[in-house]
Amino acid sequence: MSQDTVAPALPDAPREVVLVTGISGSGKSVALHALEDAGFYCVDNLPPELLPQFLRLEQARTDGAMRRIAVAVDVRSARSLPALLPSLSQLGSEGVKVRAIFLDASTHALVRRFSETRRRHPLSTGAPGEALDQHRALTDAIELERELLADLREASTVLDTSQLRAAQLRAWVRQLVQAPAGALTLVFESFAFKHGVPLDADLVYDVRVLPNPHYIDELRPLTGRDAPVADYLQQQPEVGEMLGQIEAFLVRWLPAFEQDQRAYLTVAIGCTGGQHRSVYFVEQLARRFRDRGATLVRHRELDAL
């Protein structure tokens, strides 16, 4: 189906369609299994141009009972991807809740995973339309894949899996699909700068300039979730000042992000170890914005323990 072709309306369309895509090695199979466990009917590697026809067939086959469907596509369908975004827009105009999740990871993490599994990258022996004997290095294949999927990434909710175990990824995917569709969901994420800035961050705040509970013996083994750490940080004037300024920025600009038709806005707060200050800030911000709509909390370093 070309970009200019619009499929006819789907009779008795599914209630929810989740598209899972992303960089090879980033965890698409794990995410799809998580959706299957959550009650979605899942299809892997469906050619994008067949999505509207597939949904019609499933609705007819199940008498309209198939209400939650997840479809995974990858770079092997690159030549058909231009037709995918118009198809998703068409579904949305028909009242279907459409979510697109794009899994990504750092090149370093991807190279390590391919090395551990000894699998070949799908573009290492040629991109779609290239001769099959055109070999390329793994890092070159990863960068080419990023280029081919750039438009789809821009239109999706991005999830950085670089530091995630499979169990963490499954839990995070379940959280994403449980959040209300159609409204902006705020994601507050703590992280350690020494492990890199999350790839899925929209806004990044650095709280390393604030007093560090790590240097107080009785607070060192605790986290920003614990009352003694929270009490200590609340007593520091600069902590309250920075927290208030971040809150004020979000209050001022959230309406603009909502008008931009974003599904998610990820606010990443970083400190040295991702244990005290960033965790405290995330917990406080999530509490302050909970009444404004859906909020999700993720502590990258703590969740990895």
Curated annotation (Swiss-Prot):
Matching Pfam families: PapZ_C, RapZ-like_N
Keywords (A to Z) from UniProt: ATP-binding, GTP-binding, Nucleotide-binding
Keyword Transmembrane helix: no
Tagged with keyword Nucleotide-binding: yes
One MF annotation (Gene Ontology) recorded for this entry: GTP binding
Positions that bind ATP: 22-29
Residues that hold GTP according to the record: 74-77
The family this protein is said to belong to: Belongs to the RapZ-like family.
Function per UniProt: Displays ATPase and GTPase activities.
Record's protein name: Nucleotide-binding protein Mpe_A3336
Organism, as annotated: Methylibium petroleiphilum (strain ATCC BAA-1232 / LMG 22953 / PM1)
